Amino acid sequence: MNNGIKEQIRELLKQHNAVLLAHNYMRDEVQEIADITGDSLALSIEAAKTEADVIVFCGVHFMAESAAILSPDKKVLLPRLDAGCPMADMVDARGLEELKKKHPGVPVVTYVNSTAEVKAHSDICCTSANATRVVKSLPDKKVIFAPDRNLGSFVAKSVPDKEFIFWDGYCPTHERMTVEAVLAKKTEYPEALFICHPECAPAVTALADQACSTSAMYDYCRDSKARQFIIGTEAGILYRLRLENPDKEFILASPALFCPNMKLTSQEDVLHSLKTLTPVVSVPEDIRLKAKLALDRMLAVPRD
């Protein structure tokens, strides 16, 4: 990577009292310069507690929105404003309200992969790392789960005493991974463990030795005695897995596991963002306060 750019970024971060957060799916070059890398839950927690004045969020739009919701006194920068999330765009507030009218009194559990407006119409948020705990924390026997039907189905298996009403959304990247691709890799690497994300289709997660969030994948692969792992989530995770486990082999389950939005942000974009302190992501106060309730309820659920 360009050391000159990295040095400029580090200097500007210091100058602006800024923190650089990067999601686990970012390009290698972006993860390399981040102060903190993590999944949506870890980065939400960091955004809520940071003492920095500026948060540079290397991820997609809904993540920067969540940071702005949790830290309204901070300036939140998203180096690529065009880094969106197709799954987040599959649910809107109007549609969610219509579903709520059909099921009055049923709480809405919304995956953080959603817009601020959708969060504002939800009772509680969740991430892939805490979705099961969040649902179990509710006293209700029925829940509306949006927008990811695959994560919802995964959680439902762990919470058989509750009835789920699913919004019909999905992650296009994880949806592209097929059973056939997984079986082919398992045949090619018979000793390897297959680890996948619960955003994968149920038929794929059924083949997994472990289905979990990206943060849990790091822990699982680090602690496992296995030497080979077939990884069923976005390719960006391989950077840190290989960095932290140089004696282990990580094989991407499918070349289709590539999110174009997560790959938009470059070091040059980060540098430009820090030089100009743009683009700023903000959330209207009325929406922010309602969305913050749903996020705060999630963050209040006890962690393992």
From Swiss-Prot:
Keywords: 4Fe-4S, Cytoplasm, Iron, Iron-sulfur, Metal-binding, Pyridine nucleotide biosynthesis, Transferase
GO function terms (MF aspect): 4 iron, 4 sulfur cluster binding; metal ion binding; quinolinate synthetase A activity
One cellular component (GO) term of this entry: cytosol
Lineage, top ranks: Bacteria, Pseudomonadati, Thermodesulfobacteriota, Desulfuromonadia, Desulfuromonadales
Record text on cofactor binding: Binds 1 [4Fe-4S] cluster per subunit.
Catalyzed reaction equations: iminosuccinate + dihydroxyacetone phosphate = quinolinate + phosphate + 2 H2O + H(+)
Coiled coil: none
Protein name according to UniProt: Quinolinate synthase
Function, in words: Catalyzes the condensation of iminoaspartate with dihydroxyacetone phosphate to form quinolinate.
Family classification: Belongs to the quinolinate synthase family. Type 2 subfamily.
One family name in Pfam for this protein: NadA
PANTHER family from the UniProt entry: QUINOLINATE SYNTHASE, CHLOROPLASTIC, QUINOLINATE SYNTHETASE A
Cellular localisation: Cytoplasm
